[in-house]
Structures are given as C-alpha cells and as structure tokens.
Curated annotation (Swiss-Prot):
Segments annotated as WD repeats: 29-77, 78-127, 128-170, 171-212, 213-259, 260-305, 306-345
Name under which the protein is recorded: Coronin-2B
Source organism phylogeny: Eukaryota, Metazoa, Chordata, Craniata, Vertebrata
Coiled-coil parts of chain: 436-479
Cellular component GO terms held in the UniProt record: actin cytoskeleton; cytoplasm; focal adhesion; membrane
Keyword Coiled coil attributed: yes
Annotated tissue distribution: Expressed predominantly in brain.
Subcellular location: Cytoplasm, Cytoskeleton
Assembly and oligomerization: Binds to F-actin and to vinculin.
Major subcellular location class: cytoplasm
Disulfide bonds: none
Database matches in Gene3D superfamilies: YVTN repeat-like/Quinoprotein amine dehydrogenase (2.130.10.10)
A biological process from GO: regulation of cellular response to stress
One GO MF term attached to the UniProt entry: talin binding
C-alpha cells in the first residue's frame, strides 16, 4: 500500500460546512477565577455535559476538581466547594453519558472514584465518593465510559493495564494486559465492540475489549502516535503524533489493516500535543493544539483524498485542554454543530467556543442535525459482557433536548478483599519495570527491614523483661 503525502495547501471542495466559524462566548458567559491545574499530564482536565462543567484544579495535599452548574457563569469564588476525596493529583474526569450527575475520576493515588453530584450542585466540599475502585498498582491516567452500555467503565494505569469495571458490582471483570508501556489514549468505535489505544511503545492497537485480543497492531516508526480516535462507522482511525522530523502530524488508517497509513499530513512545527475531536454527524474533524490557541477543522470522506481542509479558528490565548458538550446540549436554533470549553490557564478562564454553520433561515436544519446518539443505554452490563453488541439509541434534536426518565446509579455494597482478575491479584506488588522503580523499591524494602528489626529488638527486650519478672516471682518466698 502506498502512503499519500498530502500537500500543506488546503484543498477546497464543495461542502455545506466550508463556512463554519468559531464564536467565542461573551465574558459574562465564561467561567472566571478558576485555579486550573498546572499538572503536565496530557489530558483535558475538563468534562462537560448538559448540566455541569467539571474542571481539575490546582490544590495542595491531594487532588480536587470543581463541579459548576452551567448557568452559573461569571467569576467563581475562591472558596467555591470542591470534590476533594483523592489523596493524589486528579489526572482525568469523565461524566457518565447516561446519568448526568455521575462523574468518574482517576488519580495518582492509584484509585478510580465515582461521585454523585447533588441536583443543584455542590454546597460544601465533597470528600466521600459513592464508589471507590481499587485495582491498579500504579497511578491511573485515563478513564472512559462505554458508549452504549450503562455502568461499564474502562481505566488505564501506569501499570500498563486496562481494567474493565462493572459498576453494578463495583469490581473489575476483565483486564487487558497487552501493552508494554504507558497507555496514552483510548477510543471506542460507535457500538463499543472495539477499543483502540496508543502507547508509549509507539504502537497503535485495535483490541476486542471483552477478550483482550489484539486484532490489529501497527508499529509506527515514521509517525510517533499520541492520540487516536475512531471515525464513526467509516472503519477508519485517525491518529495525531510527531513525524521523524519532529513536526506535528496526523495519519488516517484502515482499522482492518494497520500495516500502513492511508494518508499522512504534516500540520506544523509546534511542539504541543494535537487533540483530535470527531463529529460523526457532520463527519467533521477538529484538531486543537495544546499550548496554542488554534483549532483546525476538516471534513472526512470515504473516498480520496479522504481529508479536506475547511478552516481554522485562531485565538491568541493558549489552551491547556478542551471539554466538549454532548450533541444533545447544543443550540440548534443557532445552527451550532460543536461546542468546546477551552481551558486558559494563564487567565484562570474557561471559555465556551461554538462552531456555527451560517444559515439565513431560523427553521430547524435537518441536513446538519441527523439522528444522534442519545442518553438511553442500549445494553446492560450483563448483556455486553455476554457478547452482545448494539448500536447507540438515537434521538432527534428537532424538538430540542428533553430530559428522559431519570436513571439512578445504585452503588453496590462492597467488602474489602483482594482483587483478582484473570488469575492475578492486582493489589499485589508487581515487579519493577525500570531502574528507577527498582531503586525506589529497594530503598522501601530496606526501610521496611530496618523497621522490622527494630520491632524485633523491642520484642526481645520485652520478652527478657517478662522472663526476669517470672523468675523473680518463682524465687520470691510464698506469702503465708
């Protein structure tokens, strides 16, 4: 297969999205005064749904994040209540796609936690999670909810494992153990039957998640992959990464044949990570650079040249990460097709950016709003774990988003025990993988040995004292 090297010059074609533009919200509709985390982990640190905006914050003595009702814009008070139950920095947060007041978080403290946000938002600091999930032996960098199944959560840790949690029972039910280094990104196809990952070992993988079997694997020598996203039902993957000349690059792949990318395109010479976002309804791809203020957007097609450049949104304020509003939360009366929530660390600002298709008519535009995945799960955990796949339950945006009958998350009652998956106790110490880890483990063991020796010495002294007391009692004259 030959690789098509695309020109840097934009290719114009007839498209109803060629005039899409980005509109920044007015300052009074932004969220100001937020101490956004300074953590250098390559995540968005932001999650949004139709009710709440969650942002990971800078804090001392453990990790925390804010949860703000969307209507509460403007300046946020410094003492605003936080979710602060983690003992380490929070690295990722994701809202449950089917229950809009349930959020998952993961942290450097090796745990994943599930939180239930009160109806009107937080009134005081929240320290007790609805559910604590312990199964990783090192910090947890990623969490992802299954796209069609309720209460199935995926987590990826620095122990190179992906755990699949059934939250109905509060335990890991599967473990994917095919990676040889830190997992950088996870993405599902439309029905959640396939999982694709990128890894620090420079490999791109397509995995059957229930069995953990690797279906396709690419060793990316000329394109060091960082992020990956499934392109809806096109059977295509798009990755962002770095070329051999250290320029930012994207590549398009056939998910059934990862031997060679279909196309590669160099973007620019900046060093920040490229975050890809794909809208399956409009077939539009958005590329946002970490550390710059630009968002490029393209249209994806199944025929060559596959990728057509549309336009670029430019902003002088650099972005640390971006949250994305679900489709049913968009303003269809304004022909809004995508909405970002941009984290501007230097200003402590969260800035909504609406991507709008200019139309003269105020009527509902059916051509840009097809049926879209809604808020009802298609499967139960037992059905999905039993091997059933089902497409998302679709909804129309014509009448606007109407909240369906409320689903309630019921936390299982858990007993403390060892966590065994695939015959392996996940809470046991795992062997060190690097020299630094080996040294740290060695020094910890030395400290433990020293402490145990001191305890033994104290117990020996106590034993001798008791022996002397017993001897004295035996030798003392009996009381008459």
């Amino acid at each position: 297969m030959t690789v098509t090297k695309m020109s840097w010059r934009p290719q114009y074609r007839s498209s109803k999205f060629r005039n899409v533009y980005g509109k920044v919200a007015n300052r009074e509709h932004c969220f100001d005064g937020i101490p956004i985390t300074k953590n250098v982990h390559d995540n968005h640190f932001c999650a949004v749904n139709t009710r709440f905006l969650a942002i990971v914050t800078e804090s001392a003595g453990g990790g925390s994040f804010l949860v703000i009702p969307l209507e509460q814009t403007g300046r946020i008070e410094p003492n605003y209540p936080k979710v602060c139950g983690h003992q380490g920095n929070v690295l990722d947060i994701k809202w449950n796609p089917f229950i809009d007041n349930i959020i998952a978080s993961c942290s450097e403290d090796t745990s994943v936690r599930i939180w239930e946000i009160p109806e009107g938002g937080l009134k005081r600091n929240m320290t007790e999670a609805l559910l604590e999930l312990h199964g990783h032996s090192r910090r947890v960098g990623l969490v992802e909810w299954h796209p069609t199944t309720n209460n199935i959560l995926f987590s990826a840790g620095y122990d190179y494992k992906v755990l699949i949690w059934n939250l109905d029972v509060g335990e890991p039910v599967k473990m994917i153990d095919c990676h040889t280094d830190v997992i950088l990104c996870m993405s599902f196809n439309t029905d959640g039957s396939l999982l694709t990952t990128t890894c620090k070992d420079k490999k791109l993988r397509v995995i059957e998640p229930r069995s953990g079997r690797v279906l396709q694997e690419a060793n990316c020598k000329n394109h060091r992959v960082n992020r990956v996203v499934f392109l809806g039902n096109m059977k295509r993957l798009l990755t962002t990464g770095v070329s051999r000349w250290n320029t930012r690059q994207i590549a398009l792949w056939d998910q059934e044949d990862l031997s060679m990318p279909l196309i590669e395109e160099e973007i620019d010479g900046l060093s920040g990570l490229l975050f890809p976002f794909y809208d399956a309804d409009t077939h539009m791809l958005y590329l946002a650079g970490k550390g710059d203020g630009n968002i490029r957007y393209y249209e994806i097609s199944t025929e060559k040249p596959y990728l057509s450049y549309l336009m670029e949104f430019r902003s002088p304020a650099p972005q640390k990460g971006l949250g994305v509003m679900p489709k049913h939360g968009l303003d269809v009366s304004a022909c809004e097709v995508f909405r970002f929530y941009k984290l501007v660390t230097l200003k402590g600002l969260i800035e909504p950016i609406s991507m709008i298709v200019p139309r003269r008519s105020d009527s509902y535009q059916e051509d840009i709003y097809p049926m879209t995945p809604g808020t009802e799960p298609a499967l139960t955990p037992d059905e999905w774990l039993g091997g059933i796949n089902r497409d998302p339950v679709l909804m129309s945006l014509k009448e606007g988003y109407k909240k369906s009958s409320k689903m309630v998350f019921k936390a299982p009652i858990k007993e403390k025990k060892s966590v065994v998956v695939n015959g392996i106790d996940l809470l046991e110490n795992v062997p060190p993988r690097t020299e630094n880890e080996l040294l740290r483990m060695f020094f910890r063991q030395q400290d433990e040995i020293r402490r145990l020796k001191e305890e033994l010495a104290q117990k020996d002294i106590r034993i001798r004292q008791l022996q002397l007391e017993l001897k004295n009692l035996r030798n003392s004259p009996k009381n008459c």
